[in-house]
From Swiss-Prot:
The keyword Plastid applies. It comes from Arabidopsis thaliana (Mouse-ear cress). It comes from the Eukaryota. PROSITE patterns: PPR (PS51375). Disruption phenotype: No visible phenotype under normal growth conditions. Residues 865-960 are annotated as: Type DYW motif. The gene is PCMP-H83. Belongs to the PPR family. PCMP-H subfamily. One of its GO terms (cellular component) is chloroplast. This is Pentatricopeptide repeat-containing protein At3g63370, chloroplastic. GO terms for biological process: chloroplast RNA processing; mRNA processing; RNA modification. Residues 758-833 are annotated as: Type E motif. Keywords: Chloroplast, mRNA processing, Plastid, Repeat, Transit peptide.
Length: 960
C-alpha cells in the first residue's frame, strides 16, 4: 500500500511540476491545455461522470466554489489528491484567502505522513498568490522536503521577483544532495536571465550537458532566453542552430524575441521569414516579435506585409495582443493614420491600446494631436493610467502649454498618481519647459521617492531657466547624498557654471569628476566648452589635447571656444586638422567655422568651407543657409551672398533677415527695403530682429524718412514694442542726417528710460557734428549709466581730446588705469595665400615687417607727391607734437595691412581688409587715394560697416 501511495505521489509530482513549473511559457505560447489528458479528476465518482474544465476556465466557471462545496460534503472521504487539486485551483485564481482556509483544514484533517505531499502544493499555491512569506514558512517547516517542494519554492521566488533567493536556494539544494530533475532548470535559468548572471547560467548549462538534458526542447528555449537576456546573442543563436527539431513554435519565438528585444531588427525579420518558409506556423507571439522588430520608417513596408498576413488569418486579426503590437509598430514607423484606423476597427481596445496611440503622437512630435486624442479618450469614458499620463504631460511640456499641464497635474492628484515616480519626473520636466521653476521646485519637493532622473531633470530645469545658483545648490545636495552622478547632471551643472563664469566652481566640479573617475569623452567635451566660455583657453586646450578618442564634438567644442575667445585663425586651423583626421563635420561644427571665417573676413577660407559642405551633401537651408549668406556678406562678397540667397528654395524669416542685414552692412539700404517689401508680400511676418536689420540698413544708407516709417509700421501694424536697439538705430539715423537736436529731443521723449547704448549713439553723433552742449549731456549720462565700460570711456576721452580738453582726457584715462580697464588695441587683418595675417598699430612682429614698412613709406611718398596728400593730424587724439602725430597715423594697422597687400598681390587685385575698430577719417582718405592712384579696389570692414573703395570714392559717401 505504501509503495502504491509513494508511486502515486511521484506520478502526481511529475505531472504537476511538468505542467505548472517547467512549461509555463510553453502553455501560453502554444495554447497547450493546462490539464494533461491523462490527469484523473479527483472528484470523479463512478456513478456520476464529471467533466472538469481547465484551471484557466475554472477561474470563471465557479469550479473553485464547487470544489469547496464537494470538500464540505465529503470531507472525511476526500482523497489527498482532491485537496491538492483545490490548492492548485486557488493558486491559479490567486485566491489566497481561500487557500489559507484550506491550509488550516489540511493540517486538521490529514496525518503527518501525508502532509509532505500537500505541503509542496501549499508552497505552490502561496507562490502563485504572491505570498512569499507564507510559502517560505511552509517550506521551512517541512521535515522532509521533496524535490518537488524545492523546485516549487525556486519557482515561487522567480515568479515573485526574487531571483537571487532562487539561486541561493538552488545552491542549498545542491549542498543537501537533493537530486536534480528536468523540471528544476527552467526557473533557475530564468533567474539567471533576470539577474544577468551569465556565470551561473553557463554553469547550469554545463550541468545540463552533463546530465544529458541540454537537447530537450523546453530546456533549449530557456537557455536561448537566458543567453539573450545576458547580451550573448551569439551563444543563443548557436543553441538554436544546433537544435535539430525546430518544429516547435516556442523555440522560434524564444530566438525571435531575443533578437527583437535586443534591437536586432534585421536579424529578427530574417528569422521570421525563414520560419514562415521552413518552420512551424507562426502564432500570435511570433507575429508580435516580428512587429516589434519593425522599428522606424525603413521597416514600414515590412510591417505592412506582416499586417497583411495577419488580416488573412481569422485567428490573429482580432487578438488584442496582436492589434496592440500593430498599433505600436505603425506609431514607431510614423504612420499614425494607419494606427488610428486599427483602433477604430477594434472592439476590445484596452488601456494599452490607448497608451500606444498617445505615446505614438508624442514620439512623432504631434503634441497637439496627443492632447486632443487624450481629451476625446476621457470624454468617451475610457480610463487612463500612469503610463498615458506620463506621455500626455510630456506633450504639454513640449508645447509649453502651461494651462494644459496644470490641468493634467490636477487630474493626476485627483487619481492619486502624483506619487508615481515617472509621473513626478515628467511633471518636473513639463514645468521646466514652461519656464515655471517655482512649480517645478514644488513638484520635485512633493515627490516621496526620487531617483537619479528626478535630480537630473530638476537640475537641468534650473540650469535651462537661468537659475544657475539653484542648480549648483542641488548638485551639492546630490554629492552629499553620495548618489551616482551621471553625464547628464554633470553636463547641466557645467553649463550652469559656464554662464556664471565662475572658474572656481568649474575647477571644483572638474576635481570632483577626476576623484570619482567619471571622466570620459562626453565630459571632456563639456569641459572644453565650459573652459572656453569662462575665457580660459589654457585649460580648454589642455583638456582637449588629453582626449584620446577625439570625436566631432571634441573638435567642435575647441573650434567654438577658440572663435569665442577671438582666436578665429586658430579655429580655422583646428577645422583643417579635424578634416585631415578623416572626421566629417556636422552642422554644429560648420556653423562654428563659418562664423569664424566671417569674423576674419577670410573669403578664401569661407569659400573652401562652402565647397566642403556641398561635397558632404549639406543642403542650403535653415541655419546653414543663413550662416553661408552671413559669411559671404562679412567677407565683403555681397554678390556671392545674394547668389546663395537666391538658391535657397524655402526662404523663411531667418533667411530674409540675414540678406537684409547683408545689404545693410554694405550700405545698400534701398535693396534692403525692396527685399523687406518682398518678404512681406510673401506673407512672411517680420519680427524684432528683422526690423532691427532694416533700420540698420536705413541708417547707413541715409534713408531717414523710410526709417521713421518702418518704426511706425513696427509699432502699429505688427504691434511690436521697440527694443532699445531700435531706438539706437533711429538716434544714429538722425545723427548721420545732422539732425542732432532732433535726436536729442527724441531721446528725451522716449517711452522708456534711455539706455547707455542710446546715449552712446547720441554722443557719437555729437562728436561727428561738433555739437558740444548736447555731447556734454550725453557723455555725463553715459558715464552715470556705465562708469566701468571701457568702450564708453574711450569714446568720452576721444570727444574731450577733439575739443582740446586734455586735463579731462587725463582724468578719464587715469580712471581707466585705476580700474584696471584697457582699451582694445586697434588691429587689422588680411587673408593671403590661405593664411590670415594680423597687424596692430606700428606692428613690427611680422617676418616681412621691413619690406612692409618700406612699401608703406613708398606709397605715402607717392600720394604726397602726385595727389598732394597731407596727413590730417587733428584725428590723432594724443597730446604730442605734430611730427609724432604724423608717425602715429603712418603706423595705423589698416595702412600696414594695405601695404602688405600691395606687396604680395598682383596689380589690380582686390584687397580685402578687416579692422576691429572704426576707421579714422585720415585713413579713410588714405584708402580712397590708394584705390585711385594704384587702381586697386579695397573692401574694408570696420566696426561700423563695409567700405568699398573704388577709383577714389567710397560706398559710404564719407559718412560712417
Amino acid at each position: 500500500m505504501e509503495y502504491a501511495v509513494t508511486n502515486m505521489r511521484l506520478l502526481s509530482n511529475m505531472m504537476y511540476s511538468a505542467s505548472a513549473i517547467s512549461f509555463p511559457r510553453v502553455r501560453l505560447h502554444c495554447s497547450i491545455p493546462t490539464e494533461p489528458s491523462c490527469r484523473r479528476n479527483p472528484f470523479r465518482q463512478s456513478n456520476q461522470p464529471v467533466q472538469v474544465p481547465s484551471p484557466k476556465l475554472a477561474c470563471f466557471d465557479g469550479v473553485l466554489t464547487e470544489a469547496f462545496q464537494r470538500l464540505d460534503v465529503s470531507e472525511n472521504n476526500s482523497p489527498v489528491e482532491a485537496f491538492a487539486y483545490v490548492l492548485e485551483l486557488c493558486g491559479k485564481r490567486r485566491a489566497v484567502s481561500q487557500g489559507r482556509q484550506l491550509h488550516s483544514r489540511i493540517f486538521k484533517t490529514f496525518p503527518s505522513f501525508e502532509l509532505d505531499f500537500l505541503a509542496g502544493k501549499l508552497v505552490f499555491m502561496y507562490g502563485k498568490c504572491g505570498s512569499l512569506d507564507d510559502a517560505e514558512k511552509v517550506f521551512d517547516e517541512m521535515p522532509d522536503r521533496t524535490a518537488f517542494a524545492w523546485n516549487t519554492m525556486i519557482g515561487a521566488y522567480v515568479s515573485n521577483g526574487e531571483p537571487a533567493s532562487a539561486l541561493a536556494l538552488y545552491w542549498n539544494m545542491r549542498v543537501e544532495g537533493v537530486p536534480l530533475g528536468l523540471s528544476s532548470f527552467p526557473a533557475l535559468l530564468k533567474a539567471c536571465a533576470k539577474l544577468r548572471d551569465i556565470r551561473s547560467g553557463s554553469e547550469l548549462h554545463s550541468l545540463l550537458v552533463k546530465l544529458g538534458y541540454h537537447s530537450t526542447g523546453f530546456i533549449v528555449n530557456a537557455l536561448v532566453s537566458m543567453y539573450a537576456k545576458n547580451d550573448d546573442l551569439s551563444a543563443a543563436r548557436r543553441l538554436f542552430d544546433g537544435f535539430q527539431e525546430k518544429g516547435d513554435a516556442v523555440l522560434w519565438n524564444s530566438i525571435l524575441s531575443s533578437y527583437s528585444t535586443s534591437g536586432k531588427s534585421l536579424e529578427t525579420l530574417e528569422l521570421f521569414r525563414e520560419m514562415h518558409m521552413t518552420g512551424p506556423a507562426p502564432n500570435s507571439y511570433t507575429i508580435v516579435s516580428a512587429l516589434t522588430a519593425c522599428d522606424g520608417f525603413s521597416y514600414a513596408k515590412l510591417g505592412k506585409e506582416i499586417h497583411a498576413s495577419v488580416l488573412k488569418s481569422s485567428t490573429h486579426s482580432s487578438e488584442l495582443y496582436v492589434c496592440n503590437a500593430l498599433i505600436a509598430m505603425y506609431t514607431r514607423c510614423g504612420k499614425m493614420p494607419q494606427a488610428e484606423r486599427i483602433l477604430r476597427q477594434m472592439n476590445n481596445a484596452d488601456v494599452v491600446t490607448w497608451n500606444s496611440l498617445i505615446k505614438g503622437y508624442v514620439q512623432n512630435l504631434m503634441y497637439k494631436e496627443a492632447l486632443e486624442f487624450f481629451s476625446d479618450m476621457i470624454a468617451a469614458g475610457h480610463k487612463s493610467d500612469e503610463v498615458s499620463m506620463t506621455s500626455i504631460i510630456a506633450a504639454s511640456g513640449r508645447l509649453s502649454n502651461l494651462l494644459a499641464g496644470m490641468e493634467l497635474h490636477a487630474y493626476v492628484i485627483k487619481h492619486g498618481w502624483d506619487s508615481n515616480l515617472q509621473v513626478g519626473n515628467t511633471l518636473i520636466d513639463m514645468y521646466s519647459k514652461c519656464n515655471l521653476t517655482c512649480y517645478m521646485g514644488r513638484a520635485f519637493l512633493r515627490m516621496h521617492d526620487k531617483d537619479l532622473i528626478s535630480w537630473t531633470t530638476v537640475i537641468a530645469g534650473y540650469a535651462q531657466n537661468d537659475c544657475h545658483v539653484e542648480a549648483l545648490e542641488l548638485f551639492r545636495d546630490v554629492a552629499k547624498k553620495r548618489m551616482e552622478i551621471d553625464e547628464m547632471i554633470l553636463g547641466s551643472i557645467l553649463r550652469a557654471s559656464s554662464v556664471l563664469k565662475s572658474m572656481l566652481i568649474v575647477k571644483e566640479i572638474h576635481c570632483h569628476i577626476l576623484r570619482k573617475g567619471l571622466l570620459d569623452t562626453v565630459i571632456q567635451n563639456e569641459l572644453v566648452d565650459v573652459y572656453g566660455k569662462c575665457r580660459n583657453m589654457g585649460y580648454a586646450t589642455r583638456v582637449f589635447e588629453s582626449i584620446k578618442g577625439k570625436d566631432v564634438v571634441s573638435w567642435t567644442s575647441m573650434i567654438s571656444s577658440s572663435a569665442l575667445n577671438g582666436n578665429e585663425s586658430e579655429a580655422v586651423e583646428l577645422f583643417r586638422r579635424m578634416v585631415e583626421t578623416g572626421l566629417s563635420a556636422d552642422s554644429v561644427a560648420l556653423l562654428c567655422i563659418l562664423s569664424a571665417a566671417a569674423s576674419l573676413s577670410a573669403l578664401n577660407k569661407g569659400r573652401e568651407i562652402h565647397c566642403y559642405l556641398l561635397r558632404k551633401g549639406f543642403c542650403l537651408e535653415g541655419s546653414i543657409a543663413v550662416a553661408v549668406v552671413d559669411m559671404y556678406a562679412c567677407c565683403g562678397d555681397l554678390q556671392s551672398a545674394k547668389a546663395v540667397f537666391d538658391r535657397i528654395e524655402r526662404k523663411g524669416l531667418l533667411q530674409y533677415t540675414s540678406m537684409i542685414n547683408a545689404y545693410g552692412m554694405h550700405g545698400c539700404g534701398k535693396a534692403a527695403v525692396e527685399l523687406f517689401d518682398k518678404m512681406r508680400h510673401e506673407n512672411v511676418s517680420p519680427d524684432h530682429i528683422s526690423f532691427l536689420a532694416l533700420l540698420y540698413a536705413c541708417s547707413h544708407a541715409g534713408l531717414l524718412d523710410e526709417g521713421r516709417g518702418f518704426l511706425k509700421i513696427m509699432e502699429h501694424e505688427y504691434e511690436l514694442e521697440p527694443w532699445p536697439e531700435h531706438y539706437v538705430c533711429l538716434v544714429d539715423m538722425l545723427g548721420r542726417a545732422n539732425c542732432v537736436v532732433e535726436a536729442f529731443e527724441f531721446v528725451k521723449m522716449m517711452k522708456t528710460e534711455p539706455t547707455a547704448e542710446v546715449w552712446c549713439a547720441l554722443l557719437a553723433a555729437c562728436r561727428s557734428h561738433s555739437e558740444k552742449e548736447i555731447g556734454e549731456i550725453a557723455a555725463q549720462r553715459l558715464l552715470e549709466l556705465e562708469p566701468k565700460n571701457p568702450g564708453n570711456l574711450v569714446l568720452v576721452s576721444n570727444v574731450f581730446a577733439e575739443q582740446g580738453r586734455w586735463n579731462d582726457v587725463e582724468k578719464v584715462r587715469a580712471k581707466m588705469k585705476a580700474s584696471g580697464m584697457e582699451k582694445h588695441p586697434g588691429c587689422s587683418w588680411i587673408e593671403m595665400d590661405g593664411k590670415v595675417h594680423k597687424f596692430t598699430a606700428r606692428d613690427k612682429s611680422h617676418p616681412e615687417s621691413k619690406e612692409i614698412y618700406e612699401k608703406l613709406s613708398e606709397v605715402t611718398r607717392k600720394l604726397e607727391r602726385e595727389v598732394g596728400y597731407v596727413a590730417d593730424t587733428k584725428f590723432v587724439l594724443h597730446n604730442v607734437d605734430e611730427g609724432e602725430k604724423v608717425q602715429m597715423l603712418h603706423g595705423h594697422s589698416e595702412r600696414i595691412a594695405i601695404a602688405y597687400g600691395l606687396l604680395r598681390t598682383p596689380d589690380r587685385a582686390c584687397l580685402r581688409i578687416t579692422k576691429n575698430l572704426r576707421v579714422c577719417r585720415d585713413c579713410h582718405t588714405f584708402c580712397k587715394l590708394v584705390s585711385k592712384l594704384f587702381r586697386r579696389d579695397i573692401v574694408m570692414r570696420d566696426a561700423n560697416r563695409f567700405h568699398h573703395f573704388e577709383s577714389g570714392l567710397c560706398s559710404c559717401g564719407d559718412s560712417w
